[in-house]
Amino acid sequence: KTNPGLIKILANPFSLANGFQGPEQPSDAKPYDDEVVGSWVAPFIMAPINTKNVHRSNAMLNHLYGEDFQYDEMMVTGPGEQGAAVAKMVASSNPLEGDDVPKPGEGPSKESREAGHYDVLFVGTNEQGQRIEATVTGDMDPGYGSTSKMIAESALCIVHDCAGLPGGVYTPAPAMGDKLIERLVANAGLAFDLGA
């Protein structure tokens, strides 16, 4: 059965932000030609989860990114007609349906996990039109190899580097900040680059 109250919570990008309700956020449900990135973009499967955690981090950091902060996550599909076609195809398909979807307990082989990698581009703009870019890259499949290393390093960081952290439900940025980034670079195959 459908639970309208739950659907409303799941649709709210601020549902984990301790009661804060910020400005209207960009829609991550439809493909569009993103002028900031210079490419067509399509919905990203993890965006509904990740955006809530980013807004929770901002709230826990006393709105370090601003109370008017807007955030969305999309998959870059390329410029022009080809980028538009790929974006529309991605938006119309469900990666959790079909004959080739792994069954519970199945997943990529060890070789596939180790050969995987990712490159995430963050683009920020302000009201004056200034732009900043950052990238995060990982040396293994993000859903399996890299995630397990991030979880292990987060646990070690909390135990060894954040002894004074009071109890609570945190996101990584307010709980561990740069201490976690240092561990991820040193031990988990991640690289962080803050461009201009």
What label would you give each PLM region?
Residues 1-196:
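C-terminal catalytic/substrate-binding lobe primarily of soluble NAD(P)-dependent oxidoreductases
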